Curated annotation (Swiss-Prot):
PANTHER family: TETRAACYLDISACCHARIDE 4'-KINASE, TETRAACYLDISACCHARIDE 4'-KINASE, MITOCHONDRIAL-RELATED. InterPro entries: LpxK (IPR003758), P-loop_NTPase (IPR027417). SUPFAM superfamilies: P-loop containing nucleoside triphosphate hydrolases (SSF52540). GO terms for biological process: lipid A biosynthetic process; lipopolysaccharide core region biosynthetic process. Its EC number is 2.7.1.130. HAMAP family: LpxK. ATP binds at H65, A66, G67, G68, T69, G70, K71, T72. It comes from Neisseria gonorrhoeae (strain ATCC 700825 / FA 1090). Transfers the gamma-phosphate of ATP to the 4'-position of a tetraacyldisaccharide 1-phosphate intermediate (termed DS-1-P) to form tetraacyldisaccharide 1,4'-bis-phosphate (lipid IVA). This is Tetraacyldisaccharide 4'-kinase. One of its GO terms (cellular component) is plasma membrane. Belongs to the LpxK family. Keywords: ATP-binding, Kinase, Lipid A biosynthesis, Lipid biosynthesis, Lipid metabolism, Nucleotide-binding, Transferase. It comes from the Bacteria.
Amino acid sequence: MPNFFKFHTVIERHWQKPYPVLSFLLKPLSGLFAKIAAKWRADFLSGKRQSEKLSVPVVVVGNIHAGGTGKTPIAAALVSGLQEKGVKVGIISRGYGRKSKAVYVLNAASRAEDAGDEPLLLFRKTGAPTAVGSSRVEAGRALLAAHPELELIVADDGLQHYALQRDVEIAVFPAADTGRTDLDLLPNGNLREPLSRLESVDAVVVGGRAADGFMPSEHLFGSRIEAGAVYRLNRPSEKLDISTLSGKRVAAVAGIARPQRFFDTLTHMGIRLDQTVALPDHADIFNRDLPPADVVLVTEKDAVKFSDGICTDNVWVLPVCAIIEPDLAEFVLERLEGVPKAV
């Protein structure tokens, strides 16, 4: 794992600031990937490959990047917005990082190893019925069988899962990439589909402030992340007074796509970090990963990975939420021509 993690770190740095030698080696592979990705989508659109439709409308929230776009808070905000408008909404996802590929409907006792960290976080934050499965179609069917009252399904990270027909497509795009001209497809870059794909989605949500002139879609939404009050993992009602951290050893642990963003957020909040630990995205967290510190800060996504066997008395969680403008939930319902009804 350490060697793979080191290699993956080099590649991720290359994606952000390309190394000429790596670009020379990887560019031909990106050209091949582009052809494969284009044919894959074309086969579904033409009917050469079979796609299936669920009995309720499906809204896909995904991206053309290989992770790290801040999609999960956007999906949570959309689901919450739909719930506030009275829509009975469910969530389906693949469930990266879990132990099984079988379809699984989440419940109050679900763990990250059963459902994956992101679906479990969405389930706990929104309370929306949630199912995971490598086949989004099967996950959707299982969810509707368990919750026939649902009127709409949000498919988390399903933009490239063309086997599932969708009624609305929403792509999340990081603000840091809105002004770049050196983006490329995998493996030379971190795009799963070309930028032109954004022209065919219903809406693009930019995570942060977009560069001037970035207008890939007629319907462009802005978003920002707001941090909530830090709470103790094993006693969520207990909040952390940041002013009390003076003189204490403080560490931060993150197993997300871009851990430095989490560390920077804590620093901007006025928290001095004595140690940071960056783990691979979706990685399990064990006692050995927690540094010796008076306070260990983690993300919400990592918090759901903690099991009963891990000492968590000194672990605190930073919750975040996405603010999307204008109203994305309202846009979705207008796109669907009113509140959908289950059949």
